[in-house]
Amino acid sequence: MNGAELLLGEAALARRAGRVALVCDAERVSYAALAGRVRRSAGALLAHGVRPGERVLLLMRDTPEFAAAWLGAVHAGAVAVALNSKLSEADFRHILADSAARLVVVEDVFARARPDLTAELAREGRIAIAGGALPGTPSWRAWLHDAADAAPRDAGPQAAAFALYSSGTTGRPKGIIHSHQAFRHVGGAFREFALAEGEIVFSTSRLFFAYGLEHGLLAPLAMGLTSVVAPDWPESDAVIDLAARHRPAALFSVPTVYRRLLAEPRPRLEPFRAVRRFVAAGERLSPQLVEQWREAVGGELLNLYGMSETFCPCIVTPPRTSDGTRTGMPLPGVELRLADAQGNEPPQGEPGVLWIRHPAQASGYANLPEQTREQFRDGWFCSRDLFVRDAAGFYVHQGRSDELLKVAGQWVQPRELEEVAALEAAVAEAACVPVVDADGLERLALFVAARGEPNEALRAAAAACERLLPRHKRPKWVRAVAALPRTATGKVQRYKLRELLERELSRKE
């Protein structure tokens, strides 16, 4: 078995060889052409010493060249590792060491931004430059020109095929290992949303994210759709332009992008009225955003919940049921259970930690045996997310179990404060963290990023908390920041906010 062969092998091409697989700027790549580029990419890797099971890192923009190289690594039996283009050099070096990468394929624009690291990898014979040429380093396109097509490597369903490096809010990125078996299970959300072969989809999420990789590349290929690929992180103008030009049947994005689009004048959002399905994942989808989007474009925002560890989604909002108050229901083939602190199923309506059994889930974390044993048990994965299941069988996300705080003897979920602050038009985004006060007690601090004037956002957030929250849930401190600090994968770095306030408080002592 080989995951790339499942998507682009003879059986798949017999049905759709001439159909367009990828659209990127002016380039249109058919399924047959993409399959040929994948075979050639695999041949180039094998010709330059990459062996089955070895890691190939790819630091490239989202282009057909990247898609062919990533799938080519899988085709060759290597392990494809797409890297976040916003990685710090320290995290890049960590992944290089952690993965023991045999080769790094780097687009020239990223190589030029890291001259020292590029020179080191060139001396070690572990780099090829994609895109344009870079003097003194091997050219990926020259390798492709000289390579022969390679046959797919029969790797077995449980053999490693790709890894996702997911950074938490603290610590270094960790490698999440997925097998060739995962390719059999992509596209579950597409089926739930009744997307049909030949339709066009557009995902704004980058291909190095699990969400973007499945819904922007692998699932469209598995189901015979055309995917619109944007090379760079798309801003609102680009998203609107691509929707107008390509008229996708479905848009896959994140709540932050939908919120930014809503800041545009309403006439500019007209292209979205032709889109049939709007999907959001990666962060919480609020009832307010669901309603605002419905009012603006007449479309229903549907929620997806999944993790890098499951790769594919686990929970989805069924069409015509979205109001933003419920996450959704499990996709076919996915098993879910809730557990309290003692490992027992909580009563209906009570929160519990979500455990997942998904046919596409990871085998574990690279070089982290203890964490693998802790979170992967007997075929189940512990998400560490809190959920409630209602009487109708819908799951409702309650936040992270490791973010639940006890304040004045009562449990508080920081998300509650963040949601209240986000109701205010002056607040662009908010994050709540615990901070120890002068009496040694843990209290809540709320940080807000303003849409306009910071003091207006501060006043609005504080007033909303005073008005809508019981006393024990109100923040002791409310502070404004230019933007919430985030990791390269977009997660809020709460510890940096806590340190910011701790420094302020220490100066006042």
Located regions from the model:
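Conserved ATP/PPi-binding loop(s) of AMP-dependent carboxylate-activating enzymes
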Residues: M329-G333, Q342-Q375, Q410-V412
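Conserved AMP-binding/adenylate-forming core of the ANL superfamily
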Residues: G18-T63, A67-L71, S88-R93, R141
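ANL superfamily adenylate-forming
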Residues: L103, V109-P157
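AMP-binding/adenylate-forming catalytic core of the ANL superfamily
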Residues: L87, V104-V106, H358, S363-G364, ...
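Gly/Ser/Thr-rich phosphate-binding loop
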Residues: P248-S253, L262-D323, E335
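Conserved AMP-binding/adenylation subdomain of ANL enzymes
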Residues: R184-S203, F208-A250, E264
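Conserved structural elements of the adenylate-forming
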Residues: A35-S41, F162, I176-E197, T204, ...
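Conserved pre-ATP/AMP-binding loop-to-beta segment of ANL
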Residues: G18, D146-Y165, R172, A194-I200, ...
